[in-house]
Amino acid sequence: MVPQAAKAAGRHDPEKVVAVVHALAARFGNRLVTARAVREQHANTTTWIENQPPDAVVFPQSTADVQDVVRICAAHRVPVIPFGTGTSLEGHINAPFGGVSIDFRDMNRVLAVHAEDLDCVVEPGVTRKALNEHLRDSGLFFPIDPGADASLGGMAATRCSGTNAVRYGTMKDNVLALEVVLANGELMTTARRAKKTSAGYDLTRLIVGSEGTLGVITSLTLKLSGIPEEISSGVCPFPSVEACCNAAILTIQSGIPVARIELLDALQIKASNAYSKLTLPEVPMLFLEFHGSKESVAEQSKRFGEIARELGGGPFDWATKAEDRTRLWQARHDAYWAGRSLRHGSQAVATDVCVPISRLAECVVQTQADVAASRLVAPIIGHVGDGNFHLTLLVDMADRDEIARAKALCERLAERAIAMDGTCTGEHGVGQGKMKYLDAELGEAALSAMRAIKQALDPDGIMNPGKIVA
């Protein structure tokens, strides 16, 4: 079957691309760039997926600018690829059919904060760190924390989550409404600011996770949370990865409202010690954080400690000072870069899956054995409170046999998760890298429904083609 996206002109009709570039240059002047170095920066560079740069990059400053870009591209059937900060991991920002990358660097304003309603309105180029800095004196924060300082538009587009998801949910739980430019240049508002609605189809949830394939997000209304009265963090060693996972499972099943519970295997601890200047014992660890009142945090910590001791874990090492907590969680967020330091010159390829919490230990243990049997270097980390974990494969890209073994390992991991009634991607998204698993995970009826939605909203296939469905 020829992908629907192939109907888009892109590289298939250079004359149309030239016409689009001329029209955009007339409209945007030096905010349109065609230099090869800039175009290559706007394509995938962090996995083994081929770098596929766009034909041009444009830097809009308003929703009206985005509408003009889309209308010009639509008139010539040239693809449009949204770009936030480029931290996605499955080829989302690649341009397999050429086209125009829309970089939201200059749409980075916090438009409104409604502290009394616990929400805010932002442009898509605002990063999570920038938003929380803006909110610093309000007593509020935005809790979704994927590690990378990603743009909020990109976080919504991939339906990402992060270390706080076990307590605060994922992006789908924290986006109240969106403004979206559709493939014909029209502006759609998906909802109002009310915390709940029964008014028609849930268009917000449809767009969140659509990876730019249905429209271009130009503003987001986000749910905010109050900064907890008390925050307590710490690390707890365990004799095995299985014991770590079982502790996480029992913590969740016991109803302890942990804010973060993160797994790092012994290899990842070794890497983090070296990279982040920590001195942790090189054994499997859980990094934890508890939020609430002083009394509730103390109670949560006590209950977790009892679970840990039953499984041979401990002692629990508290990070009581704010600077120690920051250092600890920065080390967790730097795990990708720390992992890369284990094997200099290698390419780090990250992949993730998510399984029902009751199958977590089984899936992680089987994956750890698979890594060893594959003769690969691949630390395991994970947001294990909701059954989500990651592999960071360190691959010699000049070794074809090693590349083949790594790809086979990733395929087995996705298949293993799906067989356990899980998903091939908990938070990285589908992009180009995981399209092939959707049939096994969702079935042909679901894929046909997705294609019908895509056809209805993007009949010419110009919106980030070659991603999610073909």
Please state what every model-predicted region is.
Residues 186, 435-470:
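Activity-critical C-terminal alpha-helical subdomain
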Residues 109-262:
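FAD-binding subdomain of flavoenzyme oxidoreductases
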Residues 1-71, 87-118, 268-276, 322-350, ...:
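N-terminal flexible segment immediately upstream of the FAD-binding catalytic core
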Residues 30, 418-430, 459-463:
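Alpha-helix capping/hinge segments and adjacent helical runs
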